Amino acid sequence: AFSAVGSLEGAYFKQFGKTVEFSEQQLVDCDKYSHACNGGLMTNGFIHWMRYAPRDESEYPYHIDPKSKCKEKQTSSNYEELRYGYRVDVGWECLYEALMHGPVSVAIRAENDEFRSYTGGIIDGDACGTDLDHGVTLVGYNADEDYWIVKNSWGEEWGENGYVRIRRGKDKGICGINQQNAQAVYNENEYVDFD
């Protein structure tokens, strides 16, 4: 949910010029194709927002409760439904191009010591693996030192104030970052199919 929300907030800002905080809890509670607190696919979140407009975080706040129920009917949305783009197995060049349109929701391999205990620096080894199990938000890159800048959902105490730097390149990418990604797009003219 956090990864998809990051991409959606970026797309909304690009289209409308307003900073918003959308509700992660809306997806956790209401996206019937995902698995609540046990995760799901970012594309399922985007599909949900195509049917039901996103809710504001202040109206539908995040809380940890595995028994939480969907409250979409009890809240209203001031936002438009979403148009979206979806990319799979596209490689680092296409991720770079997608970043020109805003933040990208990406899947990575996080269930490993290198990622879980990350405190700083650039992850550039094969210790991560490439079996995807976690969604994060790709927010930038450094061309000089050749790494991605990625926002995680584990709080500011983790990594570099909640962010991680991952080396670009390789087939599936370090921690599998090149394998699966999706990006929210509000404007039909912004949709680019990189497949």
Where are these regions (language model features)?
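Catalytic-core signature of thiol
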Residues: 1-195
